[in-house]
Amino acid sequence: MAGDLPPGRWSALLVGAWWPARPDAPMAGVTYWRKAAQLKRNEANDLRNERSLLAVNQGRTADDLLERYWRGEQRLATIAHQCEVKSDQSEQVADAVNYLRDRLTEIAQSGNQQINQILAGKGPIEAKVAAVNAVIEQSNAMADHVGATAMSNIIDATQRVFDETIGGDAHTWLRDHGVSLDTPARPRPVTAEDMTSMTANSPAGSPFGAAPSAPSHSTTTSGPPTAPTPTSPFGTAPMVLSSSSTSSGPPTAPTPTSPFGTAPMPPGPPPPGTVSPPLPPSAPAVGVGGPSVPAAGMPPAAAAATAPLSPQSLGQSFTTGMTTGTPAAAGAQALSAGALHAATEPLPPPAPPPTTPTVTTPTVATATTAGIPHIPDSAPTPSPAPIAPPTTDNASAMTPIAPMVANGPPASPAPPAAAPAGPLPAYGADLRPPVTTPPATPPTPTGPISGAAVTPSSPAAGGSLMSPVVNKSTAPATTQAQPSNPTPPLASATAAATTGAAAGDTSRRAAEQQRLRRILDTVARQEPGLSWAAGLRDNGQTTLLVTDLASGWIPPHIRLPAHITLLEPAPRRRHATVTDLLGTTTVAAAHHPHGYLSQPDPDTPALTGDRTARIAPTIDELGPTLVETVRRHDTLPPIAQAVVVAATRNYGVPDNETDLLHHKTTEIHQAVLTTYPNHDIATVVDWMLLAAINALIAGDQSGANYHLAWAIAAISTRRSR
């Protein structure tokens, strides 16, 4: 029971045991996790852009680097999705608590009005006490109902966070952290002495809106006083705010107890300036006002002073690990430690940046010294800030890298031309002043600057990110660009055309990659538990969509975008992956079971290509072939044997038989997905045949031909084995 009860003398008795505090922590968690999700999205987009720029490279090193960037992008996208789930469920918790407070306020207002009317009426005190207790009992019952509903919503929100992050049971976790899920104890009935004392004394400190009332004789107990503990807003058991709440810290004020009931009253809001102790990184936070979502509270200010692991540092360490050859991007190892650990692991304090030596420049006399005001040509340009080398990260074991010098040391200024001395030059002599050649700039080292070993799977630090194949093609252009050999106009035009073609190819590949990803996400949202892949074939003219269910068969309930092609029915290898089924492609995208899926956007393709995509070689005598295949397949339900004849001969199928056939199809559908990827091919064949029968009932001859052709191909695959 919080200290901000609804107004009214009897509010504590009416709704006090169910009254929660304001959901400030969940509301702060909504904003915090939403911003964290956006940061992770931006980092994933940055990695996607870098991967698109590197797509022009060839070779094992380039493929390995692209794979690492892709894994990092998927990991960041998963973390962003988890942050969004935490934000949404924190908002659900806050809404549940706010709704509970509103309903309890209405119940308290109605109960106070009824009790005041009872007390203002005429009659013996015993009758008034009985009527007041009846109103309190009725209000307690309504408060118990709305409190149970709010608790159920909070538990559901907590469970959703567990399902998307670390797994576990919300009920067990809440009980382990001291939250009582039982019905709170109701206050004891009011006596005549209690009513007399409350009506006679109405000071400001009473839980009914007055001063502390004198406790009745029935509440006085003997024995040493026990230390009060804060209670759960939905129960009487003590509520553990964090796993470190019993450790050393500032002492808390004693908790005042209610004169009615057994539940102690927690103190009111803390005084201004009070800083709550920070929660440990691994302990989920329980917000005030009900059990909140794990880790949904915003990190306290005390924890922010320890330089938490920010998305910028994660992205920088990941990129540094890629370019310096550290295996598997050692700077991003915090990502693989779990979503909670990656979001809260602190970094060591940064080292002070090194001082940059100042370079003195010779003083040149200007017109200002002669009394003429000097007007600069442009605004003064600020000097570039010194680049601080990254410090050693103890948590991620990242090797420090010395800053690279983009240019050589500054050339010494040329001395001014000396005044002519001696006789004037003869007629026709060279009047140009002598030119002092500046010292040659030492070449910039191209090898690894730090002491980190350069693995064969990553480019050397400071070196080019282009593969050897691309470097060979651009080597003549680099050689011709040297000052010693003048560049012919034709060679310059050729180099410019080559550069433009490479940039255009990279942009085209990036656009196609995004288009394939949108197609893949649109289809995978309907069955996220399957593996999907999409790619471009025939020099970018055909968009192929595949899944490894029965070596390429697309289930009937999957709606397809327009302008895509599916695999033709044919016997194929049993355990072929989606990559194997896709074959040779120019650009491809893949979805793994229960992987990250982006939210629909305005560019999401419309699902209008079902009948145009599901095509297969025409089967002669489709109806008789389907009837014969169904009869030979004895594992089908009996309803299929009865319906297939009526469907092929257009006799008409009753609605109850159609519904029963759909029900059997759904059961087989669930059985296949439960055992996927180790599904039984015979069960999938049953699904194909039922899909063909349903297509005939719906008048889709092309769809029935497609599903029957796949069933025949799957049966041939079983026999060949």
Swiss-Prot record:
Pfam hit, one: DUF5632
InterPro entries (UniProt xref): DUF5631 (IPR040833), DUF5632 (IPR040604)
Domain of life per record: Bacteria
Protein name: Uncharacterized protein Rv2082
Extent of Polar residues compositional bias: 470-484
Biased composition (Low complexity): 202-224, 232-250, 419-429, 491-505
Pro residues composition-biased segments: 264-283, 379-389, 435-446
An annotated GO BP: symbiont-mediated perturbation of host innate immune response
Region annotation (Disordered) ranges: 196-291, 370-513
